[in-house]
Amino acid sequence: EIVNTDAMQVYRGMDIGTAKLPPAQRRGIPHHLLDTLSVREPATVAQFQGWARAVVSQLRERGTVPVLVGGSALYTRAVLDRFEFPGTDEVVRARWEAELAAVGPAELHRRLAERDPEAAGRMLPENGRRTVRALEVIEITGEPYSASLPALEYADPPTVQIGLDIDRPTLDLRIEQRVEEMFDEGLVAEVERLFDEGLAEGRTASRAIGYREVTAYLSGDLSLAEARERTVFATRRFARRQYGWTSKDPRIVWIPYDDPQLLDRALAVVGSCA
């Protein structure tokens, strides 16, 4: 059974902009951690780790193989690897949230880069939520945020990871095509509908790539063409950073995306670890 590890596909109604697999294409296979939260609800990596590990444990207990599909490299690592989360401090968090609102995500990311360049290099400058969390951890622990990131050690050893390798020009083109398809398929209407469900109040969902750009368009801050262009740019940058995460993991078996024997090779990798 499938276990989603995409940070934004957990939200109900965020379908087009997250490229969520439609129910008709799931072929009757159970998919877990899709459409779990309303767009108003915040979600953290620590919460997601608990949810996903509980699902994996339940599947294991009944002899079903969990297939994690993502998505978000940090979320996947949090589920697979030994990863203990630092505590939280609501007062410290609130102060950094207020600073984020006052100076914006780019300036806050610059400050993080001064304190912990490694952590800053792993997250997008516009991801204010993660920057706030990193600064909170640094202040609470007195240590770099990067020191709290997961080690390359499986929490559940019988695990195999497979990645699809693709050249950057092809990936960039596919991202541009996918963004165009999302807008053509009704991303703007989806965001308008989600506004009625509280997207603007959602601390996590409102910051998703594509949704924040469309929000800027609907508020008159961007033209539609600019919203498309910025979504393409942000997605490409996100993809590069995700690749930066995964390329450093020697446990991942990479298979060319256009390999005619892709499925057979993937099954062989899984079989060799059984």
Segments predicted by a language model, with ranges:
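Phosphate/pyrophosphate-binding catalytic cores of soluble transferases and nucleic-acid-acting enzymes
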Residues: E1-A274
